[in-house]
Amino acid sequence: MRITLALVTGTMLLAGPVAAADWKLLTFPDQGFGIESPVPLVKGAGTYQAAVAGRIPTVTYSGELDNIRYKVTIIDISKRPAEALNLFEEMEALTELQGKVIGNDSMGIEPGKLRQYGRELVLQAKDGSFRRIGLMYSKGKIFQAEGTVLPGGDRESIYPERFADSIIFDLDPKRREERCADPNNFKTPEGK
């Protein structure tokens, strides 16, 4: 009995869960951002179109693994600084129309004084996909980091959230490490 139990347990341990994806920080200095991804992201192009924004060319980086699509879309609005807030809000509003909104919350990245805030949306899309989208504005660009569980994929996966929340704009690893090591960078204004 003990031998059988040991063999069954050993077999289960050896089989184990599917190996977790190997996540890496990918940096794109030409666009001024970095993001963690389990797959290489391939550069592409597209067009963002909206009533206020009009037609704006986009740069995209995307990849797919295990029925999850990872994509970053960059919209350069640096020539329209006076409209930045309105264009950001328009993008958020139009994104919400792409499915049933399950969540819409603020998100913050980078610790300390370099902290930046944006929006995070969770949608059940009309095509059955489950989308987690981080919208951030930095240095004249709107960044949309999106992890999408495609129809038939694992909706319980944490990977879309990890991807969307991992975007960074400070590409200096030493400076990031120093900021992350300083406990004062994680206190509230009241010092808590």
Language-model features, listed with the residues they occupy:
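Short N-terminal segments immediately surrounding and downstream of signal-peptide cleavage
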Residues: 21-40, 186
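Signature of long, low-cysteine stretches enriched in small and polar/charged residues
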Residues: 36-60, 92-138
